[in-house]
A protein has these predicted regions:
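Bacterial N-terminal signal peptides that target proteins for export
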Residues: 1-11
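Conserved short histidine dyad/triad with adjacent acidic residue
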Residues: 71, 86-101
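Short acidic-glycine-tyrosine-enriched beta hairpin
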Residues: 122-136
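Glycine- and acidic-residue-biased ligand/ion/polar-headgroup-sensing regions
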Residues: 103-105, 110-115
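Bacterial N-terminal signal peptides
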Residues: 10-20
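A short, N-terminal "cap"/entry segment at the start of jelly-roll beta-barrel domains
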Residues: 25-82, 167-204
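Ligand-binding loop in jelly-roll beta-barrel domains
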Residues: 80, 116, 136-162
Length: 204
């Protein structure tokens, strides 16, 4: 079902290229900061290629947004020092819990399906081809309000949150292990993110 996640590859590539330029200019200001020209490897991946991971089982009454996701671009995947990108598919009715990223900007590309998105003080429905820009420190939540799976591509302006995602998951093929709310908080700290708690999940 991950084939839907590449329906707007051209848009994703253009956005990623713009973010690379911005991120690189900031990196140049930091002494000793690694350069993507020195470390990043060119990469071409099909829809189902990448680091497929299965989310761990929550020990409370909550459930993750999706059972699996694919990390495609990150320092560990191809040496990228400026961008992180991946894909996931949300089932009908599934939600993205309210959270924010303390360091990274994020872009969400809706490749298929229909989402209702809460972003800061804004709220609206978005459809296939829609885009959400999430500045750092902005609260975001969403829900698949359609009758079909919703495919997403996520792009971060700097590495970090992929470590939260890895902490909350296991490699595909391994048995998912339980994860407590306290462990989820520890995982969030790894990627410089913060959750508002499941009680704040949106209703639609």
């Amino acid at each position: 079902m991950y084939s839907r996640t590449v329906s707007t590859v051209g848009t994703a590539v253009a956005i990623m290229a713009a973010l690379v330029g911005t991120a690189a200019s900031h990196a140049d200001q930091s002494a000793g900061a690694p350069s993507s020209d020195d470390t990043a490897r060119p990469l071409m991946l099909d829809s189902e290629e990448g680091e497929l991971r299965t989310r761990r089982i929550h020990t409370d009454s909550s459930s993750p947004a999706s059972s699996q996701f694919i990390l495609k671009v990150s320092p560990k995947n191809n040496g990228s020092q400026h961008l992180v990108a991946g894909t996931e598919v949300l089932a009908p009715g599934a939600t993205l819990p309210k959270h924010r990223h303390l360091v990274q900007d994020e872009i969400l590309l809706i490749q298929s399906g229909t989402a209702h998105v809460w972003l800061g003080d804004q709220e609206r429905d978005l459809h296939a081809g829609g885009l959400v820009f999430i500045p750092a420190n902005t609260w975001i939540s969403g829900k698949n309000i359609g009758a079909t799976p919703m495919a997403l591509t996520f792009i971060f302006s700097a590495p970090g949150f992929e470590e939260t995602m890895r902490c909350n998951s296991v490699p595909a093929g391994e048995t998912p292990t339980p994860i407590t709310p306290e462990q989820q908080k520890d995982c969030a700290h790894l990627g410089h993110s913060e959750s508002a708690g499941r009680q704040d999940n949106p209703k639609k």
